[in-house]
Amino acid sequence: MVGLEDDTERERSPVVENGFSNGSRSSSSSAGVLSPSRKVTQGNDTLSYANILRARNKFADALALYEAMLEKDSKNVEAHIGKGICLQTQNKGNLAFDCFSEAIRLDPHNACALTHCGILHKEEGRLVEAAESYQKALMADASYKPAAECLAIVLTDLGTSLKLAGNTQEGIQKYYEALKIDPHYAPAYYNLGVVYSEMMQYDNALSCYEKAALERPMYAEAYCNMGVIYKNRGDLEMAITCYERCLAVSPNFEIAKNNMAIALTDLGTKVKLEGDVTQGVAYYKKALYYNWHYADAMYNLGVAYGEMLKFDMAIVFYELAFHFNPHCAEACNNLGVLYKDRDNLDKAVECYQMALSIKPNFAQSLNNLGVVYTVQGKMDAAASMIEKAILANPTYAEAFNNLGVLYRDAGNITMAIDAYEECLKIDPDSRNAGQNRLLAMNYINEGLDDKLFEAHRDWGWRFTRLHPQYTSWDNLKDPERPITIGYISPDFFTHSVSYFIEAPLTHHDYTKYKVVVYSAVVKADAKTYRFRDKVLKKGGVWKDIYGIDEKKIASMVREDKIDILVELTGHTANNKLGTMACRPAPVQVTWIGYPNTTGLPTVDYRITDSLADPPDTKQKQVEELVRLPDCFLCYTPSPEAGPVCPTPALSNGFVTFGSFNNLAKITPKVLQVWARILCAVPNSRLVVKCKPFCCDSIRQRFLTTLEQLGLESKRVDLLPLILFNHDHMQAYSLMDISLDTFPYAGTTTTCESLYMGVPCVTMAGSVHAHNVGVSLLTKVGLGHLVAKNEDEYVQLSVDLASDVTALSKLRMSLRDLMAGSPVCNGPSFAVGLESAYRNMWKKYCKGEVPSLRRMEMLQKEVHDDPLISKDLGPSRVSVTGEATPSLKANGSAPVPSSLPTQSPQLSKRMDSTS
């Protein structure tokens, strides 16, 4: 903290008022008061008249009288002093000094003359000589108060000079000498306060400032600096009180107004972090009252409004913060976050680039720019940005997570998992990396061991211990009463999950199964509003929960008396597993959005069917499996799909195989099998569509891999992401046969393919993710296209391609075949689903609650084994919950790149002090 030394030249000298020294001695004769009309020319009357003229600032007239007197009596000490004072007011210091010196020569103990000599020395900057003169005056007359006051001033100035020269202790000594001379001299206390503040002896500093304010109640600077000390100590309320006292005596004191704005901004952040966002906003606004262009208050208002989901207001205040502080890279960064969440990626890129033009090594903006480039499929540019972020901050855990997302999207699962694990080394509690790692492991899991199950279980146990669980509910245990079903998901928009949740929302019997939707959609679209209107029209309840803390959502679920809570996301983007971990509903279920166990001991059931998870499956689950009578999915086609196009092979003269699955599913083994098929079917072609193919290096790597497998690149067409759903669906007109992926099969892509008349070849496996295609194709009536192994997969594909006429016939009938199958029979599906819910509820009413048994086992294991307790002990979970999931083609969107990171909220600016 830097304080301004009290410049005693700003102090009005107590010695001179209207040119006259307070307490100067009169001559031995009494000076009478003359009337203006009376002409006095001699003796003491003349001296008195001259003194009166001088007191009335008529210095020229007074000077003439003094000079006239001295011509007659050169030894008149009072006349010499009076003449000196008049000359002093005319800035004739040398002549004035001669007059005072002559007076001293005539009267060596004249305190008034000695004091005025000191004043002249001080005006010339000769502080030592000034002090000596004042000391002589006091030696001549110890009771002469003006000399004492002047000596205190000059000793204070000497102290300041010594301190500025680096002689702090000697300076302090001078301040104390000043106070010894004049114990009521406030500036000496004030300057001691400044010195002690610089020495970080804040208790001493406060004591000195308080004494300065006591001696001079209007001492604004002292109040201001007291406020600075309290603010730096974290006592914001006391700091604000001091600034208020300062501004009460000096309303236009700019330093204090600025400091008040800083303190109010910090107090706003403090109360906001304690949970009172509204009061925080009030303090930020009050800060702007004191400093209307204070960028930090505007910035923090942007943060607060963002947390309140008032994004338009947040944008306004970030823009203002940047306007008033063009060096505020954080404001640009956070603007980028908001624009990205609104899908305005070009504007987001512009904001991040602006932030980086201010702070080239700003790790957050480097990371966030990499996130946007990843979303856009610009993998090379994304990798460059994220690697720069890591270089700028090697311990930036989420940057490693985002690198993993990039590798996953580029199809390099091994490197993705390595990156996630690197993130977890830095931040073991990174929720994004932990869940992304689990998801990534599904892409290469063939069910040969239990490693993936153990990874889910361990994550689930650890995560559950971070949340308090409800263990009892007020829900009436009546097995036959209407049941309240809660669906919770961020994917009630044009997203893969939406195609499978629409049937239940539409066809539930709302008289027996009340539906409550908890929508965590980041950005609602037309489908969101259509779903909401449909639910409300049928008597259900729709609640938007985006941005609400997961534990608060759990409280909402409990207050709504949800009987069965169904989460639809698993370990994918923006999931609400934190709510599920609190166990707010008596029965909890996972379904649709994730092809594996959640790992949470608080989830009772996972919905599936006997083909996706056969009764003899070796795959382990934390949840108890509930198999629906037909397919565990019911697909509602997009109304924008358009008509089925003729088989392209009829006009092309060759068969085109294709896949619109993401690259993460197209593993090296999948490419080997596809290459075998293409090589076995002369002149056939392969069309693959996915987002990263807008990147040349990804395209080239993909083509090179196929060429190494014997497939010429000229036989391969690679398409990037197609934005509009109608165009995406019509792109199926390019292929004759769809090739499924393994061991992570397609879901939405398979349904889309079949609906557009394109038969799909799939392969059965040992895990749920592998068998989704088996369930879909079998229930549509295409069980003959399910292979048992790779060789059969190749042969089925080759055989299907060998008869174009039969292929064409199948294509033109496939939509009707699918529409009449259980896969698209919404009413029938809803009945089966409701039956499953009813059975779950009946079990609960009987006291059969799988999750309670697991929780008891978990608590027993933790109690019996201290190592488990240590491993699973409470720890902080870092959740970055604002990244928007990209539209996925088949059923599960990964937990996204961690959020474009928002910058810290605390004010950055240092206090100024008086």
Swiss-Prot record:
Q: Which Gene3D superfamilies match?
A: 3.40.50.11380, Glycogen Phosphorylase B, Tetratricopeptide repeat domain
Q: For the region Disordered, what residue ranges are annotated?
A: 1-39, 866-914
GO CC entries:
cytoplasm; nucleus
Q: What class of enzyme is it?
A: transferase
TPR repeat windows: 43-76, 77-110, 112-144, 152-185, 186-219, 220-253, 261-294, 295-328, 329-362, 364-396, 397-430
Q: Which UniProt keywords apply?
A: Biological rhythms, Cytoplasm, Developmental protein, Differentiation, Flowering, Gibberellin signaling pathway, Glycosyltransferase, Nucleus, Phosphoprotein, Repeat, TPR repeat, Transferase
Compartment(s): Cytoplasm; Nucleus
> Low complexity: which segments have biased composition?
19-37, 894-907
Signal sequence bounds: none
Specify the effect of residue 845 to Y.
In spy-5; induces a constitutive induction of GA signal
- Quote the tissue specificity entry: Widely expressed. Present throughout the plant (at protein level).
| UniProt cross-references to PANTHER family, sorted A to Z | PROTEIN O-GLCNAC TRANSFERASE, UDP-N-ACETYLGLUCOSAMINE--PEPTIDE N-ACETYLGLUCOSAMINYLTRANSFERASE SPINDLY-RELATED
Q: How does it assemble?
A: Homomultimer; via its TPR repeats. Interacts with GI. Interacts with TCP14 and TCP15. Interacts (via N-terminus) with APRR5. Interacts with CPN20.
* Job of this protein: Probable O-linked N-acetylglucosamine transferase (OGT) involved in various processes such as gibberellin (GA) signaling pathway and circadian clock. OGTs catalyze the addition of nucleotide-activated sugars directly onto the polypeptide through O-glycosidic linkage with the hydroxyl of serine or threonine. Probably acts by adding O-linked sugars to yet unknown proteins. Acts as a repressor of GA signaling pathway to inhibit hypocotyl elongation. Functions with GIGANTEA (GI) in pathways controlling flowering, circadian cotyledon movements and hypocotyl elongation.
What family does this belong to?
Belongs to the glycosyltransferase 41 family. O-GlcNAc transferase subfamily.
Query: What is the protein name stated in its UniProt record?
Result: Probable UDP-N-acetylglucosamine--peptide N-acetylglucosaminyltransferase SPINDLY
Q: What is the lineage of its organism?
A: Eukaryota, Viridiplantae, Streptophyta, Embryophyta, Tracheophyta
